[in-house]
Structure formats: C-alpha cells, structure tokens
C-alpha cells in the first residue's frame, strides 16, 4: 500500500535550480516511488546554522511510495551520492540535500533516522513549501497542523519565494517589485506592431535590445498573431519566425529571461532548445494536448492563461463549459464572469500539477481580451483579486492589457485622443491592476510603464 511521504529538497552549490530538478527526476525513477504528486514553491534563504556559505534554494515534494522509511532514506542518500554530494561538516554546503520530513503517520526514533524530522518546527524554509502542499496536515507528534506550526514560528522572515525566470541565472523575488515583460512580435499581422520586426532577424534582435534598455525584465517572442480573426499560422512557419530570433537574443543576453509566446508543444520545445527559458501559452494547454506534458518534461516556467477564444480558433472548452465571456449576459452578471475565470483557470493549474509541472514554475494570467466583453475586462482590472482567489491565490500573476481593444474603444473618436493615447491609457490600466496583485506586466511600451511602476511599486509593494 502506498504511503504519502514528504521530502525536503535543498541546494546551495552550483546550478541550484538544475540540481533540484535533477533530484526530482532521479526520485521519480526510484523503484518503489509510485509518483511525485506535488511540489511546493521555491524559496531562497540564507544558511541557518553555518552562515559562511552560499544562500540556499529550498522546496519540498510529496510522493507516493511503497518504501519503508529506512529504504526511502537509503534511496535519497544514493541520489545525493550520485549527484556528487560530499559530506564535509554538519549543516555545511551541499550540491543537494534530501530529507524525509514525514512518512504518513509513522513515527521512527532510530539512532540514524528520526521521522518526523526533528527540526521541522524551527525551519521556515521547510515550513513554507510544506504549507504550499499540505497546510492542514497534522504533525503526528506535535499534533498541530503545518500552518499552525508555521504561524507559531515568531521570527523575522528571511525566506523569500523566488521564480527561476532563467534558471539559476535570473531569479525573480516575488513581492519585491513588479516585473516587466516586453513584447516582441515577429508577425506580419499583429494588431499594433505587425510587420515591424518580422522582416529580418537583425531587426527583431535590435528591438529586443531596445526593450531591455528600456527596462524589460523578460522579452516575449511570438510568431503568430492571436488577435480576433487572425490567420492561423502552421507550426513550421511559426518556428521559422521565432527560433533564430530567440537564438540570437540569447547570444546577446546570456542571462536574460526569454519567453516564447506559443500554444504549440513542438514550438515550445524547439524554442527552449534555442535559448528561451519560459513558455507563455495563451490557451492554457487547451489548443495542444501535448503542451503541459512537454513543459513538465522541460522543467521550465509556464505562463498559463485563461482564454475564451484565441485568434480564429473555435471557442476554448473547459470540460463541457465554454470559456467565452462576450455576450451581454456576462456583462450583466460580472461576479459570475469573475467566478468563471477563476474556476476555469484553477482547472488548468490542477492539470499542470497533475502532469508534474513544478508549482514554482506556474504563473497564471486571467487573459484580458481573449473572448471577454469590455465590461468583463474592466471588471477584471477592478476586481483582479477576486478572479485569482481560492486555490489559485498563491500563484504569481501576469497581466496583459497593453494596447487592448477594450481600452482603445473607450476613447475611440474623442477629439483629444491622438495616436499614442491608447498606449498611455493602457499603461494607466496596468498600474491600476497592480494593487490587486499583478506580478508581471506584458507590454509593448516598456519605458512608459517603467515610469508608472516606479510610483505604483512605491505605493503598493511594501518591500520597495
């Protein structure tokens, strides 16, 4: 009979993100481990006991296993050895550290093995990812839930949730500030910038350089327009447009987070191999059944968006329910619309977790535009917190309102509205969304947004 076991994972030497991913892969292939059912978010923290060493990355995972606690300990130690861990002194630096925290309800008190782990209650870097997975799990000895134990840890937090935007080379600390994704469309038919950067790789790379200089933290490369009624491009043409551009940007910027804007698993894989570090999927995995499993196998971040419609594709279906929120019934019942976005997006996140996508690699996007009426879009701006409540509340959020039609149409025909006002208004809408917890903003006009964020972050980000 399988037992639910919780494992702590840490690294502070070498490629820490890569080490943790490799350890998870090795663990999934251990005989007697049925599957890895969940992971926590990723946390960075200073060393706790021996301070003269590099900072740690930590997380936890939950597995189903038929192994006894002792045999599981032996398997974990074998993984550590195979990955090159050298035991020097207690609490010293290590390429990988794997510890059994809980093994179901079992209690073990042997000289070389104690389960539950005796130091759980004093380690925030263990309690934080544990609470991500199982906050209501009751410690079999302390008789308290994980969440209650964490709350009783009356210490100043030095444990920060982070996002491997470009592996270990570029870690975003969530909550420290708002991050900017600059848009690079290498398409002939995108609404506002189609045809500007698709004529040559050099033109696209030059624009990427401009985006970074203006303050972009991520450059998002897309090869197919997703505007309403846009022509569907075949995958070979999409790949022809984006792969060489991504490869050249990576040569220019070794540590820059680069995302590929695609709903195709084959394009995502080739883009990651060319140097992209994030997959940005406007369909949340609904337009290609292989997308989520591909992202899981690649071990890269995945931006999972809610959409009712993408380009000229038929409306997206979430089970037996459409994602379209365009007709007047939704405009009359905005709460129902927000609930629909929340529930359907939660279902896609569940699909990611079930397919083995690490929790720390998931970013959610409510999908401004994309089959939503203007009323629904403005409700999302105003009540973003409601649309990302419940089980998806802990996840970081990306929003994209830049040059969207619902903003543009608001001022269409106004005599004071010149050629650039729609961009300015989009920036204002983005800044408004920040207070309801947007972590990344996807925009065309990076410089304008950068200025707005200087003010907004000062108001809404308590760490700034």
Predicted regions and their residues:
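Active-site-adjacent loop and "lid" segments of alpha/beta metabolic enzymes
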Residues: 149, 190-206, 226-251, 256-257, ...
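Hydrophobic/aromatic residues located in beta-strands of well-ordered beta-sheets
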Residues: 5, 36, 180, 258, ...
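N-terminal beta1-alpha1 ligand-phosphate binding loop
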Residues: 2-46, 50
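N-terminal amphipathic alpha-helix/helix-capping segment at the start of soluble metabolic enzymes
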Residues: 158-191, 357, 413, 460-464
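Short, conserved charged micro-motifs
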Residues: 16-18, 67-73
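Catalytic domains of carbohydrate-active enzymes, especially glycoside hydrolases
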Residues: 206-222, 433
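Short, charge-patterned binding micro-sites
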Residues: 38-65, 223-233, 313
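Flexible, gly/pro- and Lys/Arg-enriched active-site loops
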Residues: 48-56, 70-73, 77-169
